[in-house]
């Protein structure tokens, strides 16, 4: 930046005192200070933006290289899998799709479907012994019905 020493700053202050005058000098100094602060913040923001764009460019290049490597790995896996399938079909002497159909031990199991947010599936999957042990109500009953059920019977005498 500009090389300002103590002597140059003193010279600038003396000239400003003579030109502007002692009454307006504090107001002008405040204005100059705020403008310099805004300029410094603007320069810092520009630096941050340039650094951010450089980092984004570097990240994009890294992303491209990683994607290229992933594509290479995928193609190599596909070629090796196709070579294996070809050698397997040559060794067994039949097509791979018919070989799986002919095997008697191959049983197709149903696919598990997670209940996600379905409350009925979640509660239905809980065992009854766990519900009984943890005190889960299995039969809904209104408050009035519950009071009537557990109210002591008046008028009936119990025989001992």
From Swiss-Prot:
Source species, domain of life = Bacteria
- What UniProt keywords apply to this chain's record, in alphabetical order? Cell inner membrane, Cell membrane, Membrane, Protein transport, Translocation, Transmembrane, Transmembrane helix, Transport
InterPro entries from the xrefs?
Answer: TatA/B/E (IPR003369), TatB (IPR018448)
| Predominant place of localization | membrane
Q: How does it assemble?
A: The Tat system comprises two distinct complexes: a TatABC complex, containing multiple copies of TatA, TatB and TatC subunits, and a separate TatA complex, containing only TatA subunits. Substrates initially bind to the TatABC complex, which probably triggers association of the separate TatA complex to form the active translocon.
Single Gene Ontology BP annotation: protein transport by the Tat complex
> What protein is this chain from?
Sec-independent protein translocase protein TatB
Member of which family?
A: Belongs to the TatB family.
**Localization:** Cell inner membrane
Q: Which GO terms describe its cellular component?
A: TAT protein transport complex
User: What are the coiled-coil residue ranges?
Assistant: none
Upper lineage: Bacteria, Pseudomonadati, Pseudomonadota, Betaproteobacteria, Burkholderiales
Q: Which PANTHER family match?
A: SEC-INDEPENDENT PROTEIN TRANSLOCASE PROTEIN TATA, CHLOROPLASTIC (PTHR33162:SF1)
Function in brief: Part of the twin-arginine translocation (Tat) system that transports large folded proteins containing a characteristic twin-arginine motif in their signal peptide across membranes. Together with TatC, TatB is part of a receptor directly interacting with Tat signal peptides. TatB may form an oligomeric binding site that transiently accommodates folded Tat precursor proteins before their translocation.
Region Disordered: start-end pairs:
70-100, 133-160
Which Gene3D superfamilies does UniProt cross-reference here? 1.20.5.3310
Give a GO molecular function annotation for the protein.
Answer: protein transmembrane transporter activity
Q: Which organism is it from?
A: Polaromonas sp. (strain JS666 / ATCC BAA-500)
Note the topology in the membrane: Single-pass membrane protein
List compositional bias (Polar residues) regions by residue number: 89-100
Write out the transmembrane intervals.
1-21
């Amino acid at each position: 930046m500009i090389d300002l020493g103590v002597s140059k700053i003193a010279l600038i202050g003396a000239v400003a005192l003579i030109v502007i005058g002692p009454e307006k000098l504090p107001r002008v100094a405040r204005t100059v200070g705020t403008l310099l602060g805004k300029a410094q913040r603007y320069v810092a923001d520009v630096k941050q933006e340039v650094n951010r764009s450089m980092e984004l460019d570097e990240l994009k290049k890294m992303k491209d290289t990683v994607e290229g490597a992933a594509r290479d790995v995928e193609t190599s896996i596909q070629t090796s899998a196709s070579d294996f399938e070809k050698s397997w079909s040559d060794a067994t002497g039949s097509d791979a799709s018919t070989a799986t159909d002919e095997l008697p031990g191959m049983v197709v199991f149903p696919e598990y479907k997670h209940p996600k947010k379905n409350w009925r599936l979640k509660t239905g999957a809980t065992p009854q012994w766990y519900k009984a042990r943890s005190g889960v109500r299995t039969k809904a009953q209104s408050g009035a019905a519950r009071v009537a059920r557990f109210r002591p019977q008046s008028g009936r005498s119990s025989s001992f």
